[in-house]
């Protein structure tokens, strides 16, 4: 719920702690502006407590958005989220009957939920943190990417440095898109910013700072596509900001959005001993969790 609290702080900073708003607007901002959903009971309680401490009384529901419960969440103006990674418990598919492409991949299901939940007035937008596999998964993954680009203007993809959102080694991206008024023909070009290639290793001794995003923010141009200019060119092949047309994307194998072009350096870095130990611990935990999930799945099959 960090995005929710950060958004609330941003609004309050811009409105003199809401005092610049009318009474009606203040009530809306406090009681209706946000909506949250959490699956886990304990995390839900923490979210409610945190919201109370921030003066937010908007609803935070306990439930599974990938079940029929999530069908009612529609008409939103802005969605900011980093959905959980992995597969549905036991490997089953989502139980939403309104998903065109139900899959056991949580991220792909959440992506469908998100773009379906946006208002269709042509202004509703989303920024979603997703792992690399969403960009290149075949089968339903390709179909969902095509569906996203039809229903929404997927205008920007930010490749994040490795391991900053989740465990070390997990590669993530931020997808920025706006829902169209029609269900077809909304994406005409996609702008990519590569903040991963040829970057230093970030961690406790070298934290990622807001200043690392300065060039991206300038290139993003507040979402004004007409004001954007590539920093990449044939003369500057290591420019981090590059545009691809919709036709170029469709011509790629499996309509893959996993695009890199920078040649110098690599995604691999030199790590300190402490950072290597942290990675080993994290990967050991991930392996243990995967084994536990597999054992659970096998147990269900045996039953």
Question: Which role fits each region the language model picked out?
Answer:
Residues 1-81, 86-88, 97, 104, ...:
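Conserved S-adenosyl-L-methionine
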Residues 70-303:
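A conserved structural/catalytic subdomain of Rossmann-like adenosyl-cofactor enzymes
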């Amino acid at each position: 719920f960090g995005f929710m609290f950060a958004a609330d702080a941003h609004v309050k900073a811009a409105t003199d702690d809401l005092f610049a708003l009318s009474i009606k607007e203040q009530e809306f901002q406090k009681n209706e502006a946000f909506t949250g959903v959490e699956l886990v009971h304990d995390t839900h309680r923490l979210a409610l407590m945190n919201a109370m401490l921030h003066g937010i009384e908007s609803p935070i529901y306990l439930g599974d958005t990938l079940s029929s419960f999530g069908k009612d969440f529609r008409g939103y103006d802005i969605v900011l989220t980093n959905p959980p990674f992995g597969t549905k418990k036991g490997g089953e598919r989502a139980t939403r009957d309104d998903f065109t492409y139900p899959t056991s991949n949580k991220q792909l299901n959440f992506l469908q939920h998100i773009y379906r939940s946006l208002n269709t007035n042509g202004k509703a937008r989303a920024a979603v943190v997703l792992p690399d596999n969403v960009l290149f998964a075949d089968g339903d993954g390709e179909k969902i990417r095509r569906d996203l680009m039809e229903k929404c203007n997927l205008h920007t993809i930010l490749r994040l440095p490795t391991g900053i959102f989740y465990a070390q080694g997990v590669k993530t991206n931020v997808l920025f898109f706006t829902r169209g008024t029609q269900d077809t023909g909304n994406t005409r070009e996609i702008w990519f910013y590569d903040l991963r290639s040829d970057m230093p290793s970030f961690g406790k001794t070298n934290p990622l700072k807001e200043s690392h995003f300065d060039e991206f923010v300038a290139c993003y141009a507040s979402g004004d596509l007409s004001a954007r200019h590539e920093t990449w060119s044939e003369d500057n092949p290591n420019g981090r900001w590059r545009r691809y047309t919709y036709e170029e994307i469709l011509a790629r194998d499996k309509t893959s959005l996993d695009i890199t072009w920078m040649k110098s350096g690599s995604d691999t870095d030199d790590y300190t001993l402490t950072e290597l130990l942290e990675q080993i611990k994290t990967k050991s935990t991930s392996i243990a969790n995967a084994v536990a999930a597999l054992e659970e799945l096998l147990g269900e099959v045996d039953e």
